[in-house]
Amino acid sequence: MIVGYSVFFHHTVTRRTWCAVTIFFCRQRNVNSAMIRAISIRWLLQRPGDKRHSAWLVARSKSLLVRNLSTTNQVKGETEEPSQADLLREFAHMPVERIRNFSIIAHVDHGKSTLADRLLELTGAIARNGGQHQVLDNLQVERERGITVKAQTASIFHRHKGQLYLLNLIDTPGHVDFSNEVSRSLAACDGVVLLVDACHGVQAQTVANYHLAKQRQLAVVPVLNKIDIKHANPDQVCQDLKLLFGIDPDEVLRVSAKLGTGVSEVLERVIETVPPPQVQRDSDFRALIFDSWFDKYRGALNLIYVLNGKLEQNQDIQSLATKKVYSVKSISVLRPAECPVPDVSAGQVGLIACNMRNSKESIVGDTIHLKNQAVAAAGSYRPQQPLVFAGVFPADQSKHVALRSAIDKMVLNDSAVTVKIDSSPALGQGWRLGFLGLLHMEVFCQRLEQEHGAEPIITAPSVTYRLVLSNPKMIKQQGRDTMDISNAALFPEPHSIKEYYEPLVLGTIITPTEYVGQVISLCVERRGLQQSSVNIDDTRVLMKYVLPLSEIILDFHDRLKSLSSGYASFSYEDHGYHPSHLVRLDIHLNGKPVEELCRIVHVSKATGVARQMVLKLRELIPKQMVQIAIQACVGSKVLARETIKAYRKDVTAKLYGGDVTRRMKLLKQQAEGKKKMRMFANIRVPHETFINVLKR
């Protein structure tokens, strides 16, 4: 057909020769005829002498050929891959020796989801150029923000040295606020692909994820991505990997996930490097729940990693944590779409539906087993403790039940979030939620709105402080001499507190050398203490700082990116509690305290925060019949004050002359009336004012 096209268009012998070579090459590599026609016709239609178009066409042809070769997953001398039905039959009989469980870990925006797309295309799990990029990023918030916030799983098949292998792939988030997703995913893995951007090199979350993998003693496959970009520097990045992690540069794979270059070598290296799972198929069934989500028709769906034995449909399973028994209604494997299978065996990952209607019954990290069988807990995953807390209230109290249901379903899908009941005289009944960071909080609330139609009011984030009590009565009430508090309204009186402690984090910052001075100034401004500073190479520095958590949860990351022109990266981990000097900042309106507006701040920041709050309240509180004095106080000391003038009624407007004593009498009566009003009147603060002050 191609020769027919060439004769029809009467083009030069050179083009016909190129087409013939292309056809021969494609047929040798089993590329489908549609690809042959696409490449050849574009070449035949090229105008003679158009060198620019010719260069583009050659590059495009190479790209299409590489990606098509990856998609077909066929090399010379191998047979065609089996159909989907054949693969699912193979799934049931796949020996443990030919199973590999691995995750892709990297810093944010290093190309994890794009590489996952190429791997899915290469193994035939999805169609090439299916019209959707980042297939595993299926949440609306992920597509809007361009980041991965939820780890996703896909089971793929790949032929290696004549044998078919089952690879369970997990694409993980790269932002530090979603490190719980990475930790949860690694509980079901035996190895990781450590992906590094060949342009930006090793960044903060790369370091954190690498150490997390090594703590679990997982095999590491180092891969450099984006080698097709003009300013990529793979040699220097390989040296950085050697300096920081001791990785041999010769072991680092170089790929372009965008073009598909070198992607097949990644799968080959995974099969050769990552060990098969250490499981037992001849023992009693035991599995770890490492993810779950809610389906309105099937209830809670649980993603399980089978540690021992085998699970079949219609068997009865029991939760080790709740002791409740369920019947398995369906078993599926994610490819990444759900594909029903009759059973799952040790070493495999499966999705089970067991009519679990209460979202609280599904616990990530729980162990499940067959009914009336005694097994030990898996114990390989523990949720991280939240660092940032915020109040969540319904905009309308009539929607309290609906918001509660939405939060329960979201927490099922995000086990890092903690929920406690809270109330506020200004905002009504609500909850106090714990998150791993500010972005985690923003994404959670955005998902509440998009996926459940909720309209929550989110208060300003805070952290948990630890107090050592000196009051015997309070110690007896608490049952111990310490008290953890994240709500400033519950802050005890200073005379009842012996010591204050605030949470710290160990932050890792990687920045270009020209911005080191600005970064140090920012850290000092946020009360940071430098722990170490290492030159990665001639252009970048890795610094470690101990910082108060309260100083970084709001705008630290934004400030860091701004002063470094976007080149610095930052990640952090919990560093315990440290003694500090904290005070409770109270807001008074005409001498009366307003508990809903109080805050806990460090003594060095108290004056600045006080000034900001009184200025904001002056703008938000409307004028009233009496003058309003807004004061920010620590104890009895006033740190800042603003005044809202009262409405003025011109009581002398009706006078048109006469004795001046009449005018003075009216003004005196007005002054006495205002004085009396100040003594007995309550300041009316609109509900919207509280919302605007309290919300982030």
From Swiss-Prot:
Pfam family, one: LepA_C
GO MF term set: GTP binding; GTPase activity; mitochondrial ribosome binding
One BP annotation, GO: positive regulation of translation
SUPFAM superfamilies noted in UniProt: EF-G C-terminal domain-like, P-loop containing nucleoside triphosphate hydrolases
Organism superkingdom: Eukaryota
Annotated EC: 3.6.5.-
Transit peptide: 1-76
Subcellular location: Mitochondrion inner membrane
Membrane disposition: Peripheral membrane protein
Residues annotated to bind GTP: 106-113, 171-175, 225-228
Keywords, comma-separated and alphabetical: GTP-binding, Hydrolase, Membrane, Mitochondrion, Mitochondrion inner membrane, Nucleotide-binding, Protein biosynthesis, Transit peptide
Residue ranges of domain tr-type G in the record: 97-278
Disulfide cysteine pairs (residue numbers): none
Recorded GO CC terms: mitochondrial inner membrane; mitochondrial matrix; mitochondrion
Chief localisation class: mitochondrion
Catalyzed reactions: GTP + H2O = GDP + phosphate + H(+)
InterPro entries: EF-4, EFG_III/V, EFG_V-like, G_TR_CS, LepA_C_sf, LepA_CTD, LepA_IV, P-loop_NTPase
Top-tier EC class: hydrolase
Functional summary from the UniProt entry: Promotes mitochondrial protein synthesis. May act as a fidelity factor of the translation reaction, by catalyzing a one-codon backward translocation of tRNAs on improperly translocated ribosomes. Binds to mitochondrial ribosomes in a GTP-dependent manner.
Similarity remark: Belongs to the TRAFAC class translation factor GTPase superfamily. Classic translation factor GTPase family. LepA subfamily.
NCBIfam families according to UniProt: lepA, small_GTP
Protein known as: Translation factor waclaw, mitochondrial
Organism annotation: Drosophila melanogaster (Fruit fly)
Name of the gene encoding the protein in the UniProt record: waw
